[in-house]
Amino acid sequence: VYSKDQLQTFSEEHPVLLTEAPLNPRKNRERAAEVFFETFNVPALFISMQAVLSLYATGRTTGVVLDSGDGVTHAVPIYEGFAMPHSIMRIDIAGRDVSRFLRLYLRKEGYDFHSSSEFEIVKAIKERACYLSINPQKDETLETEKAQYYLPDGSTIEIGPSRFRAPELLFRPDLIGE
């Protein structure tokens, strides 16, 4: 990583900030520190939980961070800059599940992409067209505006209620299997 081909710098000259996931075992943290100090000879290392740094970025030190990645979602309560590990909640529903749910909805609407990159296309649609509804029950009764999405092959598809139905999975895991 620190070679002339990559960062073009020397690890001995630069302190490192390493982020870690909530509930990361102490053993993993110790092993990472060992590698950075003994292999890369870094002068300093600061390890912090991603959620704490996210909260700091908002200018706050107390709050609850909802951190949803590709495979897991954490709710992390933080008080005066310190995560409260016994109160951290984890659920194995996250972005990948929303993408799968959106793919299911799109298939029900007649869209099947017949491509080896189908999942990447659906993920891109999710990232560009989906949104969280403030009141999904109300939006279900309304004639929601359809969004046009341009596919990589130049064709377009129209996405309606699937735009807010798929992300609702994050708040209603019971939707899995419906």
Where are these regions (language model features)?
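C-terminal region/appendage detector
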Residues: 1-178
